[in-house]
């Protein structure tokens, strides 16, 4: 779990590097930090933009627009990035896990959404990723 948490923090750092906001102390910068921190801790739960905006006291459209302006990434994609990175760790760490179990443990409620997001973000299906990971481990051993 610590390794996964560390890896997810690296993702967060990469998103921050790509961000184009003037100051982390700006209102939107602080909001962004709060949102990313919350997502990094709760991505396996059912999080919606509406619930997140209510939690932080913002209009959902404003929150969505601010995140996209600061990062170039929409809320749903940011959430999917965290979930897919976690799923990749589950796949490589637990090759016997079924793809559907991996999807559910990563926070996805629908296997189709998981498969589509996984392919969009990695360029391969979860099964292909598992096969490639297994082949890479075999060639190292």
Give the location of each predicted region.
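Short, Lys/Arg-enriched, Trp-marked, Pro/Gly-tolerant hinge/linker segments that flank
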Residues: 1-4, 12-37, 41, 45, ...
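Terminal helix-turn-helix DNA-binding modules in bacterial transcription factors
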Residues: 37, 41, 46, 69-111, ...
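Core residues of bacterial helix-turn-helix
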Residues: 55-56, 67, 106-107, 118
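Short hydrophobic/aromatic patch on the recognition helix
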Residues: 62-63, 67, 71, 113-114, ...
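Short, solvent-exposed alpha-helical "recognition" segments
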Residues: 73-75, 123-126
